[in-house]
Amino acid sequence: FYLEYHHRQELSKIQNACIILISKQEMKLRLIDYKGQEIFCAPVATGKNVGDKRKQGDMRTPEGVFQVSDIQRATDWKHDFGDGKGEIDGAYGDFFIRLLVPGHKGIGIHGTHLPESIGTRASEGCIRMYNEDLKKLVSLIYPPLTVVVTPGIEDEVANHL
C-alpha cells in the first residue's frame, strides 16, 4: 500500500510540473506542462535595453534559468518611473510574481498600467503582461516553478560587445 501511495504522490508531482519559457525575441511567455505541451501563451514586454542584466538599474531583463520565489498581491503597489508623473497606482497590476535571480533583487513578472507597452522593450527589467493574462497565469502556477528567459538576436549581439 505504501509504495502505491508513494508512487501516486510522485506521479502527481510530475503531472503538475510546469515550466515558464520567456522569449525576448518573440516577446512571448509560454507555460509548458511536463509533456512539453503549451498550456498558456501570452505577449509580454521586457527591459528597455537589450542584453542580459548586468547591474541594478540597467533596464535589462535577466537571461537564464530562475525560480518563482513568491507570488504577491500588488493591487495597492505604486511605482515612480522617474518621468515626472510621480507615483503611479496600479503600475504592477494585481500580482507580482517574484523571481529568484542571483545577484539581482526586485525582478519579476507583473501586470501594467500601460497595456500599449506589451510586445515592446519597455520595462525597467521586469517582464510585463496584460493584467488579464497575469491573472490567468497566477491561477496556473505556484512556487518554486522554473522560469527560463531566452535572449533575442539583439540581446546576443549586445552580450558579445
Residue ranges and their predicted role:
Residues 2-107, 157:
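Gly/Pro-biased beta-strand-loop elements
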Residues 74-161:
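Exported/periplasmic cell-wall-interacting domains
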